[in-house]
């Protein structure tokens, strides 16, 4: 890891309702490329004395001219709370969620079955039951 990279946190807030700490993260990296999120997570884990798996960082934007990147971070009290509150796409990036993917043919058949009915009956058709 680079020693020239500095991580600062602003607008720190403890969100007891969602069992997490949330903050704006400023990464100062003069003369260097944007710091990888994994490295930011590791440094935050060291700063807040926790493990990197409960830290979620996102929304990073590098300022014009480089040298400073700003993003958002959340540190959950436990992994269970993170799984409950984080969006599925962010969990998938961490490898904590696997989307069940139906085959293309099944999706198309379901779409065409749903075209044949109107209103609340679509829910029954969408569940996989055939209309008689």
From Swiss-Prot:
Gene3D superfamilies: 3.30.70.3370. Residues 90-132 are annotated as: Disordered. It is found in: Cytoplasm; Nucleus, Nucleolus. PROSITE patterns: RIBOSOMAL_S24E. GO terms for biological process: ribosomal small subunit biogenesis; translation. Residues 101-119 have a biased composition (Basic residues). SUPFAM superfamilies: Ribosomal proteins S24e, L23 and L15e. Residues 90-100 have a biased composition (Basic and acidic residues). It holds the Pfam family Ribosomal_S24e. It comes from the Eukaryota. GO terms for cellular component: cytoplasm; nucleolus; ribosomal subunit; small-subunit processome. One of its GO terms (molecular function) is structural constituent of ribosome. Keywords: Cytoplasm, Nucleus, Ribonucleoprotein, Ribosomal protein. Component of the small ribosomal subunit. Part of the small subunit (SSU) processome, composed of more than 70 proteins and the RNA chaperone small nucleolar RNA (snoRNA) U3. Belongs to the eukaryotic ribosomal protein eS24 family. Component of the small ribosomal subunit. The ribosome is a large ribonucleoprotein complex responsible for the synthesis of proteins in the cell. Required for processing of pre-rRNA and maturation of 40S ribosomal subunits. Part of the small subunit (SSU) processome, first precursor of the small eukaryotic ribosomal subunit. This is Small ribosomal subunit protein eS24. The gene is rps24.
């Amino acid at each position: 890891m680079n020693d020239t990279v500095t991580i600062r946190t602003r607008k720190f807030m403890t969100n007891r309702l969602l069992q997490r700490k949330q903050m704006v993260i400023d990464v100062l990296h003069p003369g260097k490329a944007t710091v990888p999120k994994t490295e930011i997570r590791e440094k935050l884990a060291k700063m807040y004395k926790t493990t990197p798996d409960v830290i979620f960082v996102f929304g990073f934007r590098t300022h014009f001219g480089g040298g400073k990147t700003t993003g958002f971070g959340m540190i959950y009290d436990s992994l269970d709370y993170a799984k409950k509150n984080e969006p599925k796409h962010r969990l998938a990036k961490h490898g904590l969620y696997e989307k069940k993917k139906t085959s293309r043919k099944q999706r198309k058949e379901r779409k065409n079955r749903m075209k044949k009915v109107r209103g609340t009956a679509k829910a029954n058709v969408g569940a996989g039951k055939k209309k008689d």
